[in-house]
């Protein structure tokens, strides 16, 4: 553990179009090699697709999708007496958000649509409805935690 003072969390400024901090954070998660303008174009393109195809408010779809994908519990490895146990632990709110965004990004990348904006739009729409790759990942993590409930007394 470092002995110096704790470094404060950086504040993320809201995105210019919607004024939403979560959208800005998601753009940062999506960004590669510091190319924020490309990430913005992808996210806003996906939001336009959601607006035109679904006729729903894209910001609402995004927040519902994010809330659906957020994990409540996950497993962590804990070594006890020469054996590794997968111990279920509750996920803290900041990590919930980070995992949800990461899973949405990865699920969108794996889709087969032509552009990343189309893939992201499809993934966000499906996640908002409780389907899709990101939801599958969340359910898988929850299943792992449920299966290893017996080891929950090995709390960290």
Swiss-Prot record:
Record key words, sorted: Ribonucleoprotein, Ribosomal protein, RNA-binding, rRNA-binding, tRNA-binding
Matching Gene3D superfamilies: Ribosomal protein S7 domain
GO CC, any one term: small ribosomal subunit
Cross-referenced Pfam families: Ribosomal_S7
InterPro entries in the cross-refs: Ribosomal_uS7, Ribosomal_uS7_bac/org-type, Ribosomal_uS7_CS, Ribosomal_uS7_dom, Ribosomal_uS7_dom_sf
Highest taxon of the lineage: Bacteria
GO biological process: translation
GO molecular function ontology, one term from the record: structural constituent of ribosome
Quaternary data: Part of the 30S ribosomal subunit. Contacts proteins S9 and S11.
Family: Belongs to the universal ribosomal protein uS7 family.
Functional summary from the UniProt entry: One of the primary rRNA binding proteins, it binds directly to 16S rRNA where it nucleates assembly of the head domain of the 30S subunit. Is located at the subunit interface close to the decoding center, probably blocks exit of the E-site tRNA.
Protein name as catalogued: Small ribosomal subunit protein uS7
Species this protein is from: Paraburkholderia phymatum (strain DSM 17167 / CIP 108236 / LMG 21445 / STM815)
Upper lineage: Bacteria, Pseudomonadati, Pseudomonadota, Betaproteobacteria, Burkholderiales
Gene: rpsG
